[in-house]
């Protein structure tokens, strides 16, 4: 079914409905969104290929109050620290985060001229598993900062005492600049207007020595997973494929160095990319094999 849209990734106006969700997810249920007459289509932009989540008006209004306190629902009746310990104890071959850290450290190693103590900022640090594994993998030799707006998650991160923590929504604050590596792990899909957000992230990178790692859910989830899969929930604004993610990063003024699809140990389907300011590519070239 063809639909008129306004794609916030490429400004495209024509879309095709690829999936219809007919029941509210657990986040919507927690804020009282009813099941009667519920319909939430995922629409593929015919210009860039991104999938757009068209929320019912009632959901859109109510979810706006929930986004900054995501873990209030996600960990209802459980403990963030408990999940952290469980995931950290997983063997590397069973851990999405272990694979993520391996991708990042391998790319940094292959990209020439890495600084002796790179400054790393993880936006949306969540449970802290990614940064903790990165600290362990690099023997604490880098400088690490986690940004997390959720109060419960931020308190948990501080208790870990493994890296610096800023409890705030990332808004491109001037004090959050000068980083050699910025990571966005399963964050961008939550952003309604991803281009202005990425333009702020670019300002956080060292212009001639900066690298961005982005990982997002794959649009193929709409075809290869159940409609009740968490990835297809109401809090995700977009799903990406390599073309749409690459297009967005280029619109933000970055050079695309690598983009790929991966099936993670958890079964999640993801797209990841490395991108850098043009000055960084001129200075450092392309990553070696």
Which positions does each model-derived feature cover?
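Conserved N-terminal segment of class I S-adenosyl-L-methionine
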Residues: 1-185, 195-200, 261, 269-274, ...
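A SAM-dependent methyltransferase catalytic signature shared across enzymes that methylate proteins
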Residues: 9-16, 243-259
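Short, glycine-/aromatic-enriched active-site segment of Class I SAM-dependent methyltransferases
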Residues: 23-29, 214-239, 243-248
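Hydrophobic/aromatic residues located in beta-strands of well-ordered beta-sheets
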Residues: 144, 212-214
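A short His-aromatic
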Residues: 186-190
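A short glycine-rich, Lys/Arg-flanked "PGG" loop and its adjoining helix->strand segment in the class I
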Residues: 196-211
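Short beta-strand->alpha-helix junction loop in the catalytic core
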Residues: 218-220, 263-266
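Substrate-binding/catalytic lobe of Class I Rossmann-like enzymes that use SAM or dcSAM, i.e.
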Residues: 250-255, 267-268, 278
């Amino acid at each position: 079914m063809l639909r008129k849209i306004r794609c916030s990734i490429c400004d495209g106006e024509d879309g095709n409905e690829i999936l219809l969700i007919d029941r509210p997810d657990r986040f919507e249920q927690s804020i009282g969104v009813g099941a009667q007459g519920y319909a939430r289509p995922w629409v593929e932009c015919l210009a860039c290929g991104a999938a757009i989540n068209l929320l019912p008006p009632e959901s859109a209004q109510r979810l706006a109050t929930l986004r900054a306190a995501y873990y209030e629902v996600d960990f209802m009746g459980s403990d963030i620290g408990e999940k952290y310990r469980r995931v950290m104890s997983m063997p590397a071959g069973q851990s999405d985060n272990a694979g993520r850290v391996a991708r990042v450290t391998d790319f940094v190693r292959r990209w020439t001229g890495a600084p002796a103590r790179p400054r790393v900022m993880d936006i949306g640090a969540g449970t802290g598993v990614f940064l903790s594994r990165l600290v362990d993998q690099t023997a604490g030799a880098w400088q690490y900062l986690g940004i997390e707006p959720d109060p419960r998650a931020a308190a948990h991160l501080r208790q870990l005492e493994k890296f610096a923590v800023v409890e705030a929504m990332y808004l491109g604050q001037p004090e959050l600049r000068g980083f050699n590596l910025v990571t966005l792990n399963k964050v961008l899909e939550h952003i309604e207007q991803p281009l202005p957000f990425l333009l702020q992230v670019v300002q956080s990178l060292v212009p001639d020595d900066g690298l961005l790692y982005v990982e997002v859910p794959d649009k193929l989830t709409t075809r290869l997973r159940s409609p009740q899969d968490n990835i297809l929930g109401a809090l995700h604004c977009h799903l990406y494929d390599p073309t749409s993610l690459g297009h967005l990063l280029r619109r933000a003024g970055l050079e695309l160095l690598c983009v790929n699809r991966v099936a993670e140990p958890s079964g999640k389907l993801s797209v990841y990319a490395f991108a850098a300011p043009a000055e960084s590519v001129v200075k450092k070239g392309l990553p070696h094999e």
